[in-house]
Protein backbone atom coordinates (compact mmCIF):
# COMPACT_ATOMS: atom_id res chain seq x y z
CA UNK A 1 0.00 0.00 0.00
CA UNK A 2 2.81 2.39 0.88
CA UNK A 3 4.38 1.86 -2.55
CA UNK A 4 1.06 2.86 -4.11
CA UNK A 5 1.05 6.11 -2.11
CA UNK A 6 -1.55 4.94 0.40
CA UNK A 7 -0.81 5.95 3.97
CA UNK A 8 -0.72 2.96 6.29
CA UNK A 9 -1.54 4.00 9.83
CA UNK A 10 -1.48 0.59 11.43
CA UNK A 11 -1.05 -3.04 10.40
CA UNK A 12 -2.97 -5.82 12.10
CA UNK A 13 -2.85 -9.49 11.25
CA UNK A 14 -5.02 -12.38 12.32
CA UNK A 15 -5.15 -16.03 11.40
CA UNK A 16 -8.91 -16.14 10.77
CA UNK A 17 -11.82 -13.70 10.48
CA UNK A 18 -14.54 -16.35 10.63
CA UNK A 19 -13.80 -17.56 14.16
CA UNK A 20 -12.77 -15.95 17.43
CA UNK A 21 -9.04 -15.48 17.75
CA UNK A 22 -6.26 -12.98 18.31
CA UNK A 23 -4.88 -10.11 16.25
CA UNK A 24 -1.31 -8.83 16.43
CA UNK A 25 0.27 -5.56 15.39
CA UNK A 26 3.57 -6.70 13.81
CA UNK A 27 5.11 -3.25 14.30
CA UNK A 28 4.40 -2.86 18.04
CA UNK A 29 3.74 -6.41 19.18
CA UNK A 30 0.37 -5.36 20.63
CA UNK A 31 -2.34 -8.02 20.59
CA UNK A 32 -6.07 -8.20 21.06
CA UNK A 33 -9.09 -10.43 20.72
CA UNK A 34 -11.02 -10.86 17.48
CA UNK A 35 -14.51 -12.16 16.96
CA UNK A 36 -16.17 -13.60 13.85
CA UNK A 37 -17.29 -11.06 11.27
CA UNK A 38 -20.69 -12.77 11.41
CA UNK A 39 -21.11 -11.44 14.96
CA UNK A 40 -20.25 -7.82 14.15
CA UNK A 41 -22.60 -4.86 14.44
CA UNK A 42 -22.03 -4.11 10.75
CA UNK A 43 -23.17 -7.62 9.82
CA UNK A 44 -26.27 -7.30 11.99
CA UNK A 45 -27.11 -3.95 10.42
CA UNK A 46 -26.62 -5.27 6.88
CA UNK A 47 -28.92 -8.24 7.58
CA UNK A 48 -31.50 -5.94 9.15
CA UNK A 49 -31.36 -3.82 5.98
CA UNK A 50 -32.02 -6.87 3.83
CA UNK A 51 -28.50 -7.69 2.65
CA UNK A 52 -27.72 -11.26 1.76
CA UNK A 53 -24.56 -12.60 3.37
CA UNK A 54 -22.71 -15.41 1.71
CA UNK A 55 -19.36 -17.08 2.06
CA UNK A 56 -18.79 -17.26 -1.68
CA UNK A 57 -17.92 -14.38 -4.01
CA UNK A 58 -19.66 -16.20 -6.87
CA UNK A 59 -22.98 -15.79 -5.06
CA UNK A 60 -22.41 -12.04 -4.86
CA UNK A 61 -21.44 -11.84 -8.54
CA UNK A 62 -24.77 -13.47 -9.44
CA UNK A 63 -26.56 -10.53 -7.81
CA UNK A 64 -25.37 -8.49 -10.82
CA UNK A 65 -26.20 -11.06 -13.53
CA UNK A 66 -28.29 -9.69 -16.39
CA UNK A 67 -31.99 -10.53 -16.28
CA UNK A 68 -34.74 -9.99 -18.84
CA UNK A 69 -33.99 -6.68 -20.56
CA UNK A 70 -36.18 -3.72 -19.82
CA UNK A 71 -38.69 -2.91 -22.57
CA UNK A 72 -38.01 -0.15 -25.06
CA UNK A 73 -39.68 3.21 -24.55
CA UNK A 74 -40.36 6.14 -26.82
CA UNK A 75 -38.34 9.11 -25.64
CA UNK A 76 -40.89 11.74 -26.58
CA UNK A 77 -40.44 15.03 -24.73
CA UNK A 78 -37.02 14.87 -23.08
CA UNK A 79 -38.03 17.21 -20.23
CA UNK A 80 -40.97 14.96 -19.34
CA UNK A 81 -38.73 11.89 -19.53
CA UNK A 82 -36.22 13.49 -17.15
CA UNK A 83 -38.80 14.66 -14.61
CA UNK A 84 -40.82 11.43 -14.50
CA UNK A 85 -37.71 9.25 -14.32
CA UNK A 86 -36.17 11.34 -11.53
CA UNK A 87 -39.48 11.24 -9.66
CA UNK A 88 -39.77 7.45 -10.05
CA UNK A 89 -36.19 6.89 -8.87
CA UNK A 90 -36.75 9.21 -5.91
CA UNK A 91 -39.90 7.28 -5.00
CA UNK A 92 -37.99 3.99 -5.21
CA UNK A 93 -35.16 5.34 -3.05
CA UNK A 94 -37.38 6.87 -0.38
CA UNK A 95 -39.80 3.97 -0.24
CA UNK A 96 -42.68 6.20 -1.32
CA UNK A 97 -43.45 3.52 -3.88
CA UNK A 98 -42.69 -0.20 -3.65
CA UNK A 99 -43.64 -0.52 -7.33
CA UNK A 100 -40.86 -0.05 -9.87
CA UNK A 101 -42.15 0.60 -13.36
CA UNK A 102 -41.15 -1.97 -15.97
CA UNK A 103 -39.72 0.86 -18.06
CA UNK A 104 -37.73 2.56 -15.28
CA UNK A 105 -34.50 0.77 -16.21
CA UNK A 106 -34.79 1.87 -19.82
CA UNK A 107 -35.65 5.45 -18.90
CA UNK A 108 -32.84 5.61 -16.32
CA UNK A 109 -30.43 4.18 -18.91
CA UNK A 110 -31.40 6.89 -21.37
CA UNK A 111 -30.86 9.60 -18.76
CA UNK A 112 -27.51 8.47 -17.41
CA UNK A 113 -26.04 8.05 -20.88
CA UNK A 114 -27.48 11.23 -22.37
CA UNK A 115 -25.59 13.71 -20.19
CA UNK A 116 -23.01 13.46 -17.38
CA UNK A 117 -24.99 15.96 -15.27
CA UNK A 118 -28.00 13.63 -15.29
CA UNK A 119 -25.82 10.69 -14.30
CA UNK A 120 -24.30 12.77 -11.50
CA UNK A 121 -27.78 13.82 -10.36
CA UNK A 122 -28.52 10.14 -9.76
CA UNK A 123 -25.50 9.97 -7.47
CA UNK A 124 -26.73 13.05 -5.62
CA UNK A 125 -30.12 11.38 -5.07
CA UNK A 126 -28.33 8.36 -3.61
CA UNK A 127 -26.54 10.37 -0.93
CA UNK A 128 -29.50 10.41 1.44
CA UNK A 129 -30.64 6.86 0.65
CA UNK A 130 -27.43 4.90 0.19
CA UNK A 131 -28.71 1.43 1.10
CA UNK A 132 -31.84 1.71 -1.02
CA UNK A 133 -29.73 3.09 -3.87
CA UNK A 134 -27.56 -0.04 -3.92
CA UNK A 135 -30.65 -2.19 -4.46
CA UNK A 136 -32.26 0.13 -7.00
CA UNK A 137 -29.15 0.63 -9.15
CA UNK A 138 -28.17 -3.05 -9.03
CA UNK A 139 -31.68 -3.96 -10.21
CA UNK A 140 -31.64 -1.32 -12.95
CA UNK A 141 -28.19 -2.44 -14.15
CA UNK A 142 -29.36 -6.05 -14.39
CA UNK A 143 -32.04 -5.05 -16.91
CA UNK A 144 -29.76 -2.88 -19.03
CA UNK A 145 -27.26 -3.75 -21.75
CA UNK A 146 -24.31 -1.95 -23.33
CA UNK A 147 -23.32 1.52 -22.21
CA UNK A 148 -26.43 2.08 -20.07
CA UNK A 149 -25.46 -1.08 -18.12
CA UNK A 150 -21.89 0.13 -17.60
CA UNK A 151 -23.07 3.52 -16.34
CA UNK A 152 -25.64 1.90 -14.02
CA UNK A 153 -22.94 -0.44 -12.69
CA UNK A 154 -20.74 2.59 -12.01
CA UNK A 155 -23.54 4.24 -10.04
CA UNK A 156 -24.16 0.98 -8.15
CA UNK A 157 -20.44 0.70 -7.35
CA UNK A 158 -20.40 4.23 -5.91
CA UNK A 159 -23.52 3.47 -3.86
CA UNK A 160 -21.89 0.33 -2.45
CA UNK A 161 -18.84 2.42 -1.54
CA UNK A 162 -21.12 4.82 0.34
CA UNK A 163 -22.22 1.98 2.63
CA UNK A 164 -18.69 0.53 2.79
CA UNK A 165 -19.68 -2.70 1.02
CA UNK A 166 -16.36 -2.82 -0.78
CA UNK A 167 -16.79 -6.37 -2.05
CA UNK A 168 -19.96 -5.56 -3.98
CA UNK A 169 -18.49 -2.21 -5.04
CA UNK A 170 -15.50 -4.07 -6.45
CA UNK A 171 -17.69 -6.58 -8.25
CA UNK A 172 -19.76 -3.81 -9.86
CA UNK A 173 -16.56 -1.98 -10.87
CA UNK A 174 -15.03 -5.19 -12.28
CA UNK A 175 -18.15 -5.89 -14.33
CA UNK A 176 -18.13 -2.29 -15.54
CA UNK A 177 -14.48 -2.60 -16.57
CA UNK A 178 -15.21 -5.85 -18.42
CA UNK A 179 -17.74 -3.94 -20.51
CA UNK A 180 -15.23 -1.20 -21.41
CA UNK A 181 -15.95 -1.67 -25.12
CA UNK A 182 -19.21 0.22 -24.56
CA UNK A 183 -17.48 3.29 -23.11
CA UNK A 184 -16.93 6.25 -25.38
Residue ranges and their predicted role:
Residues 1-184:
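Charged, compositionally biased boundary regions
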Amino acid sequence: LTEAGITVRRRLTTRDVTAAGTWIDPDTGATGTTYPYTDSLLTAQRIHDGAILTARREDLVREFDPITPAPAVAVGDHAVLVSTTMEDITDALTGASRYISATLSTRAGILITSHPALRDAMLHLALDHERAATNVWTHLARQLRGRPRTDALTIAAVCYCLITDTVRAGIAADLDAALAEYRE
